[in-house]
Amino acid sequence: MGNINDKSDDEIRQMMGGCDCFVFAAGVDERIEFPKPVYDAYHKFNIAPLERMLPLAKECGIKKTVILGSYFAYLAKERPDMNLTSQHPYIRSRIDQENLAFSYADENFDVSVLELPYIFGTQPGRKPVWVILIEQLKMMDKFPCTFYPKGGTAMLTVRQVAEAIVGAAEYEDYAKFGHKKAWPISCYNMKWDEFLRIVYDARGMGSKRKVVGVPIWMFAMFGKKIEKERELEGIESGIYTPGLAEIMDMNLFIDTKYCFKDLKVTQDDIHSAIFDSIKLSVDAFEGKAKLIGMKGE
């Protein structure tokens, strides 16, 4: 165990010796804000390590690599008309990460990227990503209803992510993809209002609270306010908030066949995974649990 970025090349070679597959499940995502330009931080933590690790993996005789990416990259490729890479530095970085990784693929080195959506479930000692959602929802508790985008999202559980990694590592037919493959990942597709019913139930408020879908322009207006606050603080987010409105309004669903058929992922209880994630997020928000959050360094 240790920080791979602190290891010398020789130490990494020793760690990789005798291994069949290299899995990159590190880096940072869009939740972490940095000083402008934020893209530089994403390159440092998500791309530069691969520029170093993948050549070492090939040198050590490793035959496969699995990289944990984002389903925003899937959306950017499916909907080039949305110009997501020009709006959102984080999405641009994920596309660049995929392209860099695929440049190392050959007949002796299969490269796969899991384009992961939202993940539910808990990890011992780790702060859930959903604490920020609790902060947002609590601001609306005083209202008779909750205002939220109309769309929905792909999702899966923590355990299913692990199974997808194993499935990608053991997949034997990468040759037909030119030894490189981006896997769109989803085990469940859920509308935001259905998701929020589970969230409110986990918060102890029942599952009957009314959720009102907001139009894109209203979400975008709220996003502009957030961007102005960030600018005053000298920070930049990887996702441009006004542009997020269109994404949140759409049903960002993915065919589950890639997980269940190709990668041999098994069914899980997504309702319980969401419930547990929110319960722990509430505890973290209220200071009842000491947890480690995501950080760059």
Locations of regions flagged by a protein language model:
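Substrate-binding strand-loop-helix patch
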Residues: 153-159, 181-202, 216-221
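NAD(P)H-binding glycine-rich loop region in Rossmannoid oxidoreductase-like domains
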Residues: 2-48, 52, 74
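A conserved pocket-lining segment of Rossmann-fold NAD(P)-dependent short-chain dehydrogenase/reductase
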Residues: 135-156, 176-179
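Terminal hydrophobic/aromatic helix or amphipathic segment near a protein terminus
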Residues: 175, 196-250
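Amphipathic terminal alpha-helices
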Residues: 250-297
